[in-house]
Amino acid sequence: KQFTKCQLSQVLKSMDGYKGVTLPEWICTIFHNSGYDTQTIVKNNGKTEYGLFEINNKMWCRDNQILPSRNICGISCNKFLDDDLTDDVMCAKKDLDSEGIDYWLAHKPLCSEKLEQWLCEEL
């Protein structure tokens, strides 16, 4: 599914303020990772990254490419490609708990200041 900024802001409201990360920071980071498209798959340094949050198959989810995956989220990577973001959010929070927001490389250079453009006026 291709989300808009406002659709995604609505769905991800529960992430606002989690571990000190604001919703606009998430919206910006997701935009730079996946362009708000749940079908995103990126091959990167021998890993494959899935979905809005670019969750990878080396640490967080399992697919049939890398054996063994640590599979910290205990889930198939393909679950991050569907329209239900519940499991994506759960795994992204685990990722954040473990690694911090700068684990998403777009965050620090692109999403740590001047965040007004990432707010949804409709909320």
UniProtKB/Swiss-Prot annotation:
Disulfide bonds join 6-120, 28-111, 61-77, 73-91. It is found in: Secreted. Keywords: Calcium, Disulfide bond, Lactose biosynthesis, Metal-binding, Milk protein, Secreted. One of its GO terms (molecular function) is lysozyme activity. Residues 1-123 form the C-type lysozyme domain. It comes from the Eukaryota. Signal peptide: none annotated. GO terms for cellular component: extracellular region. Gene3D superfamilies: 1.10.530.10. GO terms for biological process: defense response to Gram-negative bacterium; defense response to Gram-positive bacterium; lactose biosynthetic process. InterPro entries: Glyco_hydro_22 (IPR001916), Glyco_hydro_22_CS (IPR019799), Lactalbumin (IPR000545), Lysozyme-like_dom_sf (IPR023346). Ca(2+) binds at residues 79, 82, 84, 87-88. Mammary gland specific. Secreted in milk. The keyword Chaperone does not apply. PROSITE patterns: GLYCOSYL_HYDROL_F22_1 (PS00128), GLYCOSYL_HYDROL_F22_2 (PS51348). Its main location: secreted. CDD domains: LYZ_LA (cd16898). Belongs to the glycosyl hydrolase 22 family. Regulatory subunit of lactose synthase, changes the substrate specificity of galactosyltransferase in the mammary gland making glucose a good acceptor substrate for this enzyme. This enables LS to synthesize lactose, the major carbohydrate component of milk. In other tissues, galactosyltransferase transfers galactose onto the N-acetylglucosamine of the oligosaccharide chains in glycoproteins. Lactose synthase (LS) is a heterodimer of a catalytic component, beta1,4-galactosyltransferase (beta4Gal-T1) and a regulatory component, alpha-lactalbumin (LA). This is Alpha-lactalbumin B/C. The lineage of its organism: Eukaryota, Metazoa, Chordata, Craniata, Vertebrata.
